[in-house]
Amino acid sequence: VNTAKYLASLPPHTFRQSHAAFHFLLDYVPGWERAFGRGGLIQYQSFLPRESAEAAWTEMLKLSHQRGLPAYLGVTKRHRPDRFLLSHAVDGFSAALDFKVAGGNRLALSSMLQEFDRIVVAAGGRFYFAKNSETQPGATARFLGARTISQFKRLKRRCDPDGLLASNLYRRLFA
């Protein structure tokens, strides 16, 4: 996908497109969500510093192939850090990998993605919570740090003193 987008952008093929069309390419491919079959997919997205991205991704992809659980789609992007309290952005790169859920491989995928979390944390990386359904509280605590989580929980208590605003993602990672 990245190569096709790059080649399509070379002169004389330049063109304007909307922000959404550029960033959410698959939303414009009819029926793309059916490509993974009835079981669907699990997406895993990591953000790694420039210095450690290649080595960490190499380790993750080797593990994926050793387990017989290859990513069927991968998208990489360049990122810069931001000042958001729970930011996933680093001065480096992200890789979003889509894994097919089929034939009873869900538990094996979950186990492998938790190993990916350990690789990412060891490499100084971060996660995109909304895409990483298998990330556990321990991995979140290791990459954000106790101070950041404490600050977030204080902010949550101040803005939501009755605890009415809580998603499953919040309960899984922070409660």
Task: Identify the residue ranges that each predicted region occupies.
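Noncatalytic alpha-helical scaffold of FAD-dependent oxidoreductases
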Residues: 1-175
